[in-house]
C-alpha cells in the first residue's frame, strides 16, 4: 500500500487525506494543535469545491447544515445596488460554518482509514519524504504540506518568494439572524475603504465580515466599535447589524498572500494556504484547496514516480490558482487603495465588472474547474441584474 503524510488538518489537509485514502493510500495526518478545529465564522463554497465534496460523498451531509445562496449583491453604504448576480446550479454558492465543514471532512477522512495525530508539530521536512515530528522521524512516499500561510515546509524547502502583502484585514463574526436576512442572499456593502458582508449561513445565524485597511485602528478593533461602523453604513445600522455583532466574539485576521517559487520539491507538495493563500474577495480559499488536493491525488495515484507526478500536477493546474490570486488582490485594491477623490468612478467600475459575462468567466475561472473529470467547464450564462451605476452623488 502506498503511504502519505499530511501536515495540517485544515480544509486542505483533510481534503488531501480523503482524496488519497479513497484511492487506496495509507494516510497519517499530523496536526500541531491538541484538537482538529477551525477558528472562524462562515465559509463560502463555490462550484469547484462543491463538485469535490460531491465526489467525497459529503454533499448531502453539508447541505443539511448550510445555506444555498440564491443571489449576490454589491451595494453602496445606503443600500443602492451596484451589482447583482443571480446564483443557480451553473454558478452555485453555498455558505456554511467553518467548524461544520471541518467536522464533515474529518469524519470522512477517518471513515476512509486516515489516522490523525494531534499535538504533533512538524519540525523539519526533507525532499525524500522524511518528516521530523517533535524530534521523532517518520517517512512516507509522499508528503503533503497543508500547514498554512506561515508554512514550515515551504520555508524549510526554500520555496518562499517575497510578495507584497495586502493592506486589508477582516473581522469575521457570527450573529443572530433577523428578519432583515430572511432571504438567502449575500450582500456586500461598500463605504470608502470599508466593506461589510452579510450572508445567512444557518437557519438562525448570519456570517458577517467587516473589512478595513490595516492602518484603520478603529476599523480593525474587536469587539467592534458600533458607532464607528454605524456612521459609515447607515443602512446596516438601521438593520441593527452592528449592535448584534458587537456582543459576539469576532476574530480579526490580516488578509494573507503567499507566492511560492514552486509548489513541489522532491516528494513534498504544498497545498492550501501554504501554496496559494489569497485575500477572500473571490470566495475561493476553500475551493482552491479542495480542487487542488483532489487533482494532486489523481496525478500521484496514476504514476509511480512521485516527484514527476507532482511536477506535472503543478504544471497543468497552477495557472488557475495564480489567476485567482491576481484577481483577488486586484478586487481588494479597488477597496483598500482606490483614490478617495474618484470613488464615484469606482461605482461605475464595479457596475461594469458585474455586467461583463466574459470578464466574470475569466476572473472566476476557478469556479468552473471540475477536478473529478480534470476539466475546466464552459463559462455559465448566469443572469446579471445590474442596473445603472450609482450616481456621482454616492461615494459608495
What are these regions (language model features)?
Residues 9-22, 30, 145, 249-335:
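Conserved mid-domain beta->alpha element of the FAD-binding
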Residues 12, 35, 150:
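Conserved Rossmann-like nucleotide-cofactor binding loop
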Residues 186-218:
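Active-site substrate-recognition segment that forms the wall
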Amino acid at each position: 500500500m502506498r503511504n502519505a503524510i499530511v501536515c495540517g488538518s485544515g480544509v486542505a489537509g483533510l481534503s488531501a487525506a480523503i482524496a488519497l485514502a479513497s484511492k487506496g493510500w495509507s494516510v497519517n495526518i499530523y496536526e500541531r494543535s491538541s484538537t482538529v478545529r477551525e477558528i472562524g465564522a462562515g465559509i463560502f463554497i463555490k462550484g469547484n469545491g462543491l463538485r469535490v465534496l460531491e465526489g467525497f460523498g459529503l454533499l448531502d451531509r453539508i447541505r443539511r447544515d448550510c445555506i444555498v445562496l440564491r443571489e449576490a449583491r454589491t451595494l453602496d453604504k445606503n443600500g443602492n445596488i451596484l451589482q447583482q448576480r443571480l446564483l443557480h446550479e451553473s454558478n452555485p454558492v453555498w455558505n456554511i460554518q467553518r467548524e461544520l465543514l471541518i467536522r464533515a471532512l474529518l469524519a470522512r477522512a477517518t471513515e476512509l482509514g486516515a489516522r490523525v495525530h494531534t499535538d504533533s508539530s512538524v519540525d523539519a521536512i526533507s525532499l525524500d519524504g522524511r518528516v521530523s515530528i517533535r524530534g521523532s522521524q517518520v517517512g512516507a512516499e509522499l508528503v503533503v504540506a497543508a500547514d498554512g500561510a506561515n508554512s514550515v515546509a515551504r520555508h524549510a524547502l526554500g520555496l518562499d518568494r517575497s510578495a507584497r502583502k495586502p493592506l486589508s484585514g477582516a473581522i469575521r463574526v457570527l450573529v443572530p439572524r433577523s428578519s432583515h436576512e430572511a432571504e438567502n442572499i449575500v450582500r456586500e456593502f461598500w463605504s470608502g475603504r470599508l466593506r461589510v458582508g452579510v450572508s445567512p449561513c444557518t437557519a438562525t445565524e448570519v456570517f458577517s465580515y467587516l473589512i478595513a485597511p490595516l492602518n484603520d485602528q478603529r476599523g480593525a478593533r474587536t469587539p467592534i466599535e458600533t458607532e464607528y461602523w454605524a456612521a459609515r453604513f447607515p443602512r446596516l445600522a438601521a438593520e441593527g447589524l452592528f449592535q448584534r455583532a458587537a456582543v459576539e466574539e469576532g476574530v480579526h485576521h490580516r488578509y494573507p498572500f503567499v507566492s511560492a517559487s514552486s509548489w513541489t520539491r522532491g516528494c513534498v507538495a504544498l497545498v492550501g494556504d501554504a501554496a496559494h493563500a489569497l485575500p477572500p474577495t473571490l470566495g475561493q480559499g476553500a475551493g482552491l484547496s479542495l480542487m487542488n488536493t483532489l487533482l494532486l491525488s489523481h496525478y500521484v495515484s496514476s504514476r509511480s514516480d512521485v516527484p514527476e507526478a507532482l511536477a506535472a500536477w503543478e504544471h497543468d493546474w497552477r495557472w488557475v490558482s495564480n489567476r485567482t490570486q491576481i484577481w483577488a488582490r486586484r478586487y481588494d485594491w479597488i477597496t483598500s487603495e482606490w483614490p478617495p477623490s474618484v470613488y464615484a468612478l469606482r461605482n461605475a467600475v464595479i457596475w461594469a465588472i458585474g455586467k461583463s459575462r466574459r470578464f466574470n468567466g475569466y476572473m472566476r475561472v476557478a469556479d468552473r474547474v471540475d477536478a473529478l473529470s480534470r476539466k475546466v467547464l464552459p463559462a455559465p450564462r448566469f443572469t446579471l441584474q445590474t442596473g445603472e451605476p450609482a450616481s456621482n452623488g454616492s461615494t459608495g
